[in-house]
Amino acid sequence: FDAVEPASSEAVLKAQLSNSTLPVIGGVAIPSVAINLPIFKGLSNEALLYGAGTLSPTQKMGEGNYALASHRAQSPDLLFTPLDDVAIGATIYITDLENIYTYTATSTVRVQPTDVYLLDEVAGRKMITLITCGEMGGVTRRVVQGDLESVTPVADATDEMRAAFNMEQRTF
């Protein structure tokens, strides 16, 4: 996280003008709060302005503690800002474009940036961890965690799953 810059106007302009191609590896959607974002490999500033980035280069969807981060924005509906409104029991979908992994939110907390234990693997648990700044300026972190409920091939996706990934993507 040390190399990640706050979501400033300068950072947005720099990302919009950069020629970098972002490595899209999938998507994350939380219908109850209208989150639908691409997932990029890694935590570059550009990735966090246009979607969610993976915290570990070796993590795999549906295994262990799959962790994603994205920016908080001034606008309440951009990027991971809506994580504040995720309720326990909410459905969280991620996809690697081959399967859709369905998680159920089990906790939502605000923690200190040093509380990295939330990224640890938990024996026997397949989970997701979603992280954003707790407020503009990043004094704390908002963390939503959930447990894996099912894995569905994309070809067998339900109408609800398809609708989640067809929602508007709200990024910079």
Regions found by a protein language model. Name each.
Residues 1-172:
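Solvent-exposed, non-transmembrane regions of membrane-associated and secreted proteins
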